[in-house]
């Protein structure tokens, strides 16, 4: 948490041996990482924060903007968003709790990975329609 520039300065000044930050933030801010050794993690190696990388828009329901958003909204991404938010809620987590959650839909199946604050990791796959039950099962096995 905190200012990206401050973190990078502390890394350059030797206050950190290394840091893990979200690549999307650097892309969005236009910050070059050419002077750093960079390693991207896959979701099976390092479970990201829930809903990491999902762009959300909020507006008044029933407005013209609401209708435009419906047109560009990706249904699979929305299901992943809902799944990961359900995980946050079930764990009683917020932005200060180190919980990872990642879901992905392919061929009508959703795969879910959850990592709790102790580092324990659980995962599962099911039909998209059964995602709520899968989340309950995974949470109970943590």
Residue ranges of model-derived segments:
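Small-molecule-sensing regulatory modules
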Residues: 2-142
């Amino acid at each position: 948490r905190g200012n990206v520039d401050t973190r990078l300065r502390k890394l350059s000044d030797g206050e950190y041996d290394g840091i893990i930050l979200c690549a999307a933030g650097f892309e969005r801010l236009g910050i070059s990482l050419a002077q750093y050794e960079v390693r991207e993690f896959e979701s099976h190696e390092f479970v990201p924060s829930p809903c990491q990388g999902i762009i959300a828009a909020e507006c008044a329901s029933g407005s013209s903007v609401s209708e435009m958003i419906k047109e560009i909204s990706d249904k699979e991404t929305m299901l992943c968003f809902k799944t990961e938010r359900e995980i946050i809620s079930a764990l009683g987590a917020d932005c200060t709790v180190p919980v990872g959650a990642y879901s992905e839909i392919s061929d009508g199946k959703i795969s879910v990975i959850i990592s709790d604050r102790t580092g324990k990791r659980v995962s599962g796959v099911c039909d998209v329609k059964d995602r709520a039950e899968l989340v309950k099962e995974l949470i109970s096995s943590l």
